[in-house]
Amino acid sequence: MKEFIPSKLPLKKDIETKEILRATITAHKTLAELKGIANSLPNQKIVINTLVLQEAKDSSEIENIITTYDEIYRSDISDSFINSDIKEVQNYKDALYLGFDIIKTKKFLTINHIKEIQSTLEKNDAGFRKQSGTVLKNPTTGEIKLIPPQNPKDIEELMTNLVDYINDSSLEDFDSLVKMAIIHYQFESIHPFYDGNGRTGRIINILYLVLENLLDVPILYLSRYIIKNKADYYRLLNDVSFNDGLNNWILFILKGIEEISKETIKTIKNIENLMNETKNIIVEQKPKIYSKDLLEAFPDVKGFSVTNISYIR
């Protein structure tokens, strides 16, 4: 198999078919509903903390880093519970928060920002690949599916082009959700790092939604959708490169945005119910200590919701 070098962006293709336009409208509708519900919450922090934890676990699971919620919460209480997989999940959470802070303060994303996010994930400063030899294989069969760019100059040029595309909406007159699908494919195809490409790419997804003002906080994550549709995810991703499958890839991502938006709305409502139940229990059993400040402090309590995370989901 030959080395595959993706075309630079914009693609200059007519890809917004009627089917894609319909799927885009539906995805926007559910995403807007999610944004509105999240913004109406009196305390967004507990929602963000819960969903970031779920994403850190799920995104790591795609890379065969398997943990449980109880293990994660125990590690938050005491370092004695930390193992290598738990540390990977914690690193992902730190990298995601770092990226969100960058978008909030800078309002754009640079190559150095992406390197910083990946460095937080992998705890190394290797930066972009400088040595050849990286290949992408089928995780089940071991078959080589893609040989990404090998020349460091190509990687640097493609990543410069990608961040320009991320930051400059005038480069292509596509809907932002369609562009997110293109950005995700492009990053995966470049595969600029030795390690952590998949998780870095999924962080870029949510940061792009915030950058485009489609969400105010990082609460929509496609990792659960990818886990449920893992074979389709890798097949469709590969088809973009070799079978002119960009339209099907975009439809897959738009469906994921719609599906996960609905699931996240349900999760937020469950969190609200849980908080109200907690409030009622405290008022009934410990009325002297109850206060609004106490209830809103729960997200900062180590181990909070360790017994309720399955109910929240």
Predicted regions: what is each one?
Residues 1-313:
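FIC/Doc superfamily catalytic core
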